[in-house]
Amino acid sequence: METNTMSQQEENQQIAARKVKLEALREAGVNPYPSGFKPDIDLASVSRANGNEMDPATLERVSVKVAGRIMLLRNFGKLTFATLQDESGRLQISAQRDVVGAELYSTVFRKIEVGDILGVEGHLFRTKVGELTVQVERFELLSKAVRPLPEKFHGLEDVETRYRQRYVDLIVNTEVREIFKTRSRVISRIRQFMEHRGFLEVETPMMHPIPGGATARPFVTHHNALDTDLYLRIAPELYLKRLIVGGFERVFEINRNFRNEGLSPRHNPEFTMMEFYQAYTDYRELMDFTEALVQDVVKDVNEGELTVAYQGQELDFSGPWARLTPAEAIVRYMEADAARITERGYLESLAESLGIKAETSWDDGMLLLTIFEEGVEHKLMAPTFIIDYPISVSPLSRRSDDNPDIAERFELFIAGREIANAFSELNDPADQASRFQKQVEAKDAGNEEAMHFDADYIRALEYGMPPTGGEGIGIDRLVMLLTDAANIREVLLFPQMKREG
């Protein structure tokens, strides 16, 4: 690995020198990769349990058995100081030749380097500057590192290297570990919220015979035994709604979706969604539910506060959140003429002002949505529900009883990006079949993201699905908001990258 401050040649030289030490240890009868060492306490707990108020005599009676990776190392001949790091934090150790034994000190301890993993036993004391330290009485090398870590004061800063070699990033950048602890906490809190409200967590297929549930290009694979193509799922929606047909009234799933699309600060081909469906509710009740869910998660990870600092701005999650139609949002944020917002010619002029050339295949709904996406979406910083989408761009959503051209649908936007998408579900099998057919026609006309016709799903609807509300929430984007991450790859442990070389 080439770091910011170390050339490939320098790194190769260090690797060679470390391998020489590794062989010297083996020749001395030392196993550089043993097993069996069991720490009895983590490093942060040592510090918490032994505060500044403890007198030196009492402190010296405290014995600990700890392990960690060496992050700092200072040799002073017969005395060595090192800083160990484990998942919980850091702690200094001190090894003296006269205490651990001259032979062990010279043949083993002096061959230990930054990056090595060490287990030690000893008692506690404080240095002259007051730093809590373990006086090493016994030690064991647990893992010899043959690659050097990035230099102490420069760290690992190159983003490509950080994402590609996340294991190094996690070692040297403690704030990165905190991001993924927060991510885990967010998912755990969502799961608790759903379970406490009677939702059943389920698992649906990751490989689909027919891609569906969203408009996106799928990844294609092949099942050799069945000699058939399968598709990595772009959404679990149609399977989850089959469960509603089957009698489960509240279901949710937290899992991966896959979409064969481009990479961007907001998009990764593999991403995590929480999708849920509830019988006997609609999209308006889901807005209240979503507001409560997100607020609960924000307070849990933000020390009870509903204000979050994100990329230099303060996001206020306290309610009630704004609710606007796409047309109302265009009027508000683009200063468009409300009296003309339904005119085709006026919409085309708005699109042209944004550099958008309307395609002849676009109906007014698609044109309106494109104007919203290009001209408004990035301006929606405070949590905002965009509601009542055109039915033509919502092929799985129920029509409004008041206006058949409108879908009972909303999307939640925060910090200029979509966080959730929800609707009152379409449960009329004939209407759904008609919309599937229009999607097939769009696909035949060249729209690679249009949906396929799923005859089995139509068959399921023909058995009767109760009135249902459903929603998908982007976990990755929600975590971005709560960790002040500008790029989705910051919140994915192993984001998709171009192949090296």
Swiss-Prot record:
Mg(2+) 2 binds at E418. It comes from the Bacteria. One of its GO terms (cellular component) is cytosol. It holds the Pfam family tRNA_anti-codon. It is found in: Cytoplasm. It catalyses: tRNA(Lys) + L-lysine + ATP = L-lysyl-tRNA(Lys) + AMP + diphosphate. Transmembrane segments: none annotated. Its EC number is 6.1.1.6. This is Lysine--tRNA ligase. It comes from Magnetococcus marinus (strain ATCC BAA-1437 / JCM 17883 / MC-1). The gene is lysS.
